[in-house]
Amino acid sequence: MGKVVGIDLGTTNSCVAVMEGGKPTVIANAEGFRTTPSVVAYTKNQDQLVGQIAKRQAVMNPENTFYSAKRFVGRRVDEVNEESKEVSYGIEKAGSNVKLKCPVLDKQFSPEEVSAQVLRKLSEDAGKYLGENITQAVITVPAYFNDSQRQATKDAGKIAGLEVLRIINEPTAAALAYGLDKKSNERILVFDLGGGTFDVSVLEVGDGVFEVLSTSGDTHLGGDDFDRCIVDHLASIFKSNEGIDLRQDKQALQRLTEAAEKAKIELSNATQSEINLPFITATPEGPKHLDLNLTRANFEELASKLIDRCRVPVEQALKDAKLSTGEIDEIVMVGGSTRMPAVQELVKRVTGKDPNQTVNPDEVVAVGAAIQGGVLAGEVKDILLLDVTPLSLGVETLGGVMTKMITRNTTVPTKKSETYSTAVDGQTNVEIHVLQGEREMASDNKSLGTFRLDGIPSAPRGVPQIEVTFDIDANGILSVTAKDKGSGKEQSISITGASTLSDNEVDKMVKDAESNASVDKEKREKIDLKNQAETLVYQTEKQLGELGDKVDASAKAKVEEKSKALKEATSKEDYEAMKKLLEELQQELYAIGSSVYQQPGNQPPAPGTPDSNESNDKGGDDDVIDADFTETKD
């Protein structure tokens, strides 16, 4: 079995780690950073950019730069109305699924495809570091992700060419990293506020056992929302002063978003931040600039509702775990957004404890995923992980009611069966509507899909016995089976109403990603070849100039001819000719170099003969200087 990497696929930033010598190691990306922005872009030349370079060009290319894709993964269009208004790229509907519009390619991407490109970069960078091809990974998801979102994350891994061995909850991964060396039992609360999601998990940790007691959260709350507070504040001030809504201009919106994120980060350490955006827009009267100061107190006031929303999941998780704040030993803070002083104050206020600051909030989740990868690969022994399902699962029954079969915070993997019957006389088929959520009415919960069981023998209502089985695997992904006990007919779920991709769509995306990877590789090779050619032409001109008359005239003419031909091939982008001429010119230069050294006076000294600059005087005993040393003591 090859190396299994752990990947924290974040909303704003992602991170990859691996077990080395029994210890988890965070792997720096090709640019040298330990975290990678979860950003994918396509340039006007149709080149793909991923990570830091994609983020850097976002202002100039807002409609073809995709970020925060995690907020759309595994969700339907009607579930992302608010999020779709806050991004600079276009969101389109394909059936009930979300598609991201890429004008420069005249193409639509699923959010899973964008996430897959981030995963591919992380796995490729890890492969370069480890010196082997990475094909297996453990990927983290927010604890409060529903079944569709988990399956969609797994699909993203598959599109990236990875076998996803396990989907693990982010707070659980953080607890693994925190508690790896802990021998004594501790009850810990993991407070995970990332770029787009918020989770709270309560765990019992000690002596290799990690048991999740409860989990709660909000998949619509994260650092992006805090940025948006600042964006709205800046835009409303500018509108009241200038009468222009900057949010309607995609380029201006992107600049505002970047400035807001920068200000938010600065305000975690400073009491005020200066926001200066020259030439943010223009009117017939001339260019307009945005310049103002934002204080920490002002920011905390703007974000007060968001900060208050962090309280409820903490209280809910403690209630579900049947624990008081006094029974919690440590508060582990995870996610970059936990650096905000107001968030730390809230945690201290609610729990009565100072948060534990010993873990790196940006890297701890990837480290935990790497540990889980080590467990699955057999590198890490004596660790038992007992996770839970975050939301209740059930079916719709008579009257539009949701009947729960597996309640939230049930330890996974788990399996449960219930027997149901028909609602009318002579009914020969039933439709099973699978739901996830905590509300009483089916319509208020998340629909995971529907499927039919046909071939039920005609009988009075209430007589047929239909056994429905829910089976949740260790990834938290659900499969459902319905069986008629009378006829023995059985049907597994074939989701028709879910937002996840079909197997055919995933397979097509895998093939597209593979072909794009080979196209990208070819582009890179061509760019490298062009760079080599340009460098060699420059070095040739420089070398000929430095050597001057030392080079034979005919040899010089030959080299100049080859150099000129290579220059022309480079400007025409004739790669076959470039390859041939590059090799020929190098050979000519080697020949010139040899001929220069063979000229009289340029030969290197024979082995064993002294250099002309060296003295022949070997020195004798007279050259030895004696010295006496005396040790002085204070």
Curated annotation (Swiss-Prot):
It comes from Prochlorococcus marinus subsp. pastoris (strain CCMP1986 / NIES-2087 / MED4). GO terms for molecular function: ATP binding; ATP-dependent protein folding chaperone; unfolded protein binding. Residues 592-634 are annotated as: Disordered. Belongs to the heat shock protein 70 family. Keywords: ATP-binding, Chaperone, Nucleotide-binding, Phosphoprotein, Stress response. Induction: By stress conditions e.g. heat shock. The gene is dnaK2. Acts as a chaperone. It holds the Pfam family HSP70. This is Chaperone protein dnaK2.
